[in-house]
Each structure stands twice: as C-alpha cells, then as structure tokens.
Amino acid sequence: MAKKEGALELEGTVVEALPNAMFRVELKNGHRVLATISGKMRQHYIRILPSDRVVVELSPYDLTRGRIVYRHK
C-alpha cells in the first residue's frame, strides 16, 4: 500500500453509510469525518458496514474529509 506524502492515518469506526460510497467515520479522538473508499478497496469489492473498524487517511489541508484505506478483520 503506497503512502501519501504528508497524509495522516487515523483509526476509527464507521457510524453510518451514506449514498455514493461515502461513510461517516468517528475517529478515536472523537472527531467525525466524511470518508470515501480508496480505489483499490473498490476494485477488490471490499464491503464496509456500519460498526466496522477502519483506517482513514486524512489530508493535512482538509481534516473533515478522508479516504478509507484499510478495514480491520
């Protein structure tokens, strides 16, 4: 998995599934972010459901949106 330069990776829990493959994720520190699935997860048909533990990659420029890069088993 390629890491983005300067991106923050935080762990959280999916709170709700939204339309267009978007998810509301509550991070460990209590913040809620809007996240979408990364391209590789979409390619391999990895399904994400509410209450799944995930790793979210956040850009330092916009900390309210992120990309889900890993789903814990």
From Swiss-Prot:
SUPFAM superfamilies: Nucleic acid-binding proteins. It holds the Pfam family eIF-1a. Its main location: cytoplasm. GO terms for molecular function: ribosome binding; rRNA binding; translation initiation factor activity. InterPro entries: NA-bd_OB-fold, RNA-binding_domain_S1_IF1, S1_domain, TIF_IF1. It comes from the Bacteria. This is Translation initiation factor IF-1. Gene3D superfamilies: Nucleic acid-binding proteins. CDD domains: S1_IF1. One of its GO terms (cellular component) is cytosol. It is found in: Cytoplasm. Belongs to the IF-1 family. It comes from Cutibacterium acnes (strain DSM 16379 / KPA171202). Residues 1-73 form the S1-like domain. NCBIfam families: infA.
